[in-house]
Amino acid sequence: HTAEVARQAGLRLRTVYFGGGTPTSITAEQLKKLTDCVAEHFDLSEVWEYTIEAGRPDTITREKLQVIRDAGVTRISINPQTFNDDVLRFVGRKHPAQAVVDCYEMARELGFDNINMDIIAGLPTDTLDSFRHTVERLLELGPENITVHTLSVKRSADLSGEKAVDLSSLTGDVTEMVDYAQRRLMENGYEPYYLYRQRNILDNLENTGYCKPGKEGLYNVYI
């Protein structure tokens, strides 16, 4: 129906974005059905950018990445959040940091040349030194896009009970974390190109997307 409305209105599709969740949580077969459906009903010939959030490494396989690649996807996200294994465990992630690196390298092997990686400043139990390590590890990997989020606790987050979070207790180093990320990314040729805020965000800060020159995430700009 959406495709038909777009055709009748004479609209041309410029960006495709699957995310705001984890599309790779479905099977490779389901993922292929999804991308085939998009290709069947929409004219992708004038699409400038096609993004899928691969997200968590525990949902990524070579088969799924190949399906995505074959569908013409030009940009993916592989999100470490942090490279500190202890912090990952505390916030409920079931993978080690190395798994992110492995998925990133696998994506490069398959030919992906536009990769975004998200990190979060202010995660519970994280420290300024640990966050600096995360930033430096990202710079070593060299993705085309890096998005620096500031922690915003959502209702569904597994930070209740023993992991209950007092937002006021997490604000200590978060501004320094964000400032460090900005300085180091810009020193290494990344440019800030979009930002947005969320509810319950620490220190009233924002989320900022950085990119290498000419690698802006177009969907992020348009919204």
Spell out what each predicted region is.
Residues 1-181:
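Conserved non-cysteine loop/helix-boundary elements of the Radical SAM core domain that shape
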Residues 156-223:
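A C-terminal junction/extension of Radical SAM enzymes
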